[in-house]
């Protein structure tokens, strides 16, 4: 039975998303586009016949594949601000398409699907806004991933293969059709990936191997920054237990003391290796043992962030399918089961309300150094996994 308070979900969700959109428009027009400027510069180089310089001539590090610069270079025919607006408009369209992709998985009354979807977006509002602000591509990666996983068409897997090479963050998802013995989908994803790798050759670049080598060097040069913006579990281990001063961004340029001097470099390295192995085993366990379902795919999409040494805040748009599944169940709880909302409300707070605008510079800096958004993401994974193994979400 649908609780009486459910009638408030739609108006409150619409109002919240409206506020989210207004905030996003203001942020992107006032102080946005930092990462998009790097993309735009690379696209300009391709259009001017200087594709070989995309990794050497950049306002910041360009870390994406050569095909990303080549395939999307037509966007640089437009002036920067128009191109940036078009880029973010495409993101909004992608999120609308995602609404229809996930609609078959609405558990309750279809009339409540719209507020469920809106509140799932609100759950990731902070990483969503950051992705829009900086002009990042994580929203596109999320939508392409869920399109392939939910529709299981060869076309969707072909496109996922293309974008997975552009930003290798989602490459592990290409293992899914192979383990599920869906040969056509697997071949399609490989074809897309190969096209994405080899596309510069199609354009006739003589220095194709050099470009790939420069791309690899650009990725390797990222290093392992322990600054507070890095929300990875591995960075958290070093910040907590190495005893080294760290850079908390909101505190200024000087490093500050944080954490405890408990473990040696070797011990911390071994802890990180153990964590990565544990995550890989967990990923493979779900991949091999669970049946094809939205629960399985939401978990796999969420887990890909866990072993990374670099996890920036907009990456947590990948929390969306987990939030969707959990809210699908919890928004309609009644009576004594309402206590289950508390950890999810706490997770929402960790994800969205720990910025300096809400709790001030000092406290927000400490929360950021504790990888608070990753902790929220881990809670969502734990909740979704335990729920999926005890009952259907």
Could you tell me what each predicted segment is?
Residues 2-156, 180-313:
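Primarily membrane-embedded glycan-assembly and transfer machineries that use lipid-linked glycans
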Residues 10-11, 171, 340:
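Sec-dependent signal peptide recognition
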Residues 89-97, 136-144, 163-170, 190, ...:
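Membrane-embedded alpha-helical segments of multi-pass membrane proteins
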Residues 97-101, 143-153, 176-181, 321-335, ...:
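Transmembrane alpha-helices and membrane-interface helical segments
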Residues 160-177, 308-318:
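Transmembrane helices and adjacent periplasmic/lumenal helix-loop junctions
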Residues 292-296, 308-320, 329, 335-339:
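Short amphipathic alpha-helix initiation/capping segments at coil-to-helix junctions
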Residues 304, 319, 350:
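Residues in well-ordered beta-strands of folded domains
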Residues 324-393:
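Aromatic-enriched
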């Amino acid at each position: 039975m649908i609780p009486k308070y459910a009638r408030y979900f739609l108006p409150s969700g619409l109002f919240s998303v409206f506020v989210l959109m207004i905030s996003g428009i203001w942020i992107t027009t006032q102080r946005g586009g930092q990462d998009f400027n790097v993309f735009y510069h690379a696209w300009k180089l391709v259009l001017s016949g200087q594709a070989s310089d995309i990794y050497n001539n950049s306002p910041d590090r360009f870390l994406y594949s050569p095909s990303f610069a080549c395939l999307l270079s037509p966007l640089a025919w437009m002036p920067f601000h128009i191109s940036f607006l078009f880029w973010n408009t495409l993101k909004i369209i992608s999120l609308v398409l995602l609404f229809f992709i996930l609609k078959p998985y609405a558990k309750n009354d279809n009339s409540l699907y719209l507020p469920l979807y809106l509140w799932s977006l609100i759950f990731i509002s902070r990483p969503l806004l950051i992705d829009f602000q900086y002009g990042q591509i994580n929203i596109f990666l999320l939508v392409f991933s869920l399109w392939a996983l939910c529709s299981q068409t060869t076309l969707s897997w072909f496109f996922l293969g293309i974008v997975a090479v552009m930003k290798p963050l989602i490459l592990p998802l290409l293992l899914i059709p192979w383990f599920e013995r869906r040969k056509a989908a697997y071949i399609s994803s490989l074809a897309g990936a190969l096209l994405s790798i080899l596309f510069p050759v199609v354009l006739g670049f003589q220095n194709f191997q050099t470009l790939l080598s420069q791309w690899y060097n650009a990725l390797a040069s990222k290093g392992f920054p322990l600054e507070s913006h890095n929300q990875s579990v591995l960075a958290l281990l070093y910040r907590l237990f190495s005893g080294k001063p760290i850079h908390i961004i909101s505190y200024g340029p000087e490093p500050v003391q944080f954490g405890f001097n408990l473990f040696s470099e070797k011990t911390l390295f071994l802890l990180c290796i153990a964590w990565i192995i544990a995550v890989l085993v967990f990923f493979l366990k779900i991949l091999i043992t669970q049946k094809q379902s939205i629960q399985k795919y939401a978990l796999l999409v969420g887990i890909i962030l866990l072993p990374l040494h670099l996890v920036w805040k907009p990456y947590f748009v990948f929390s969306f399918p987990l939030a969707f599944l959990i809210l699908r169940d919890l928004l309609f709880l009644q009576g004594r089961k309402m206590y289950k909302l508390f950890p999810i409300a706490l997770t929402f707070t960790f994800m969205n309300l720990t910025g300096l605008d809400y709790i001030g510079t000092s406290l927000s800096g400490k929360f950021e150094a504790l990888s608070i958004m990753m902790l929220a993401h881990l809670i969502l994974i734990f909740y979704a996994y335990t729920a999926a193994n005890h009952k259907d979400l």
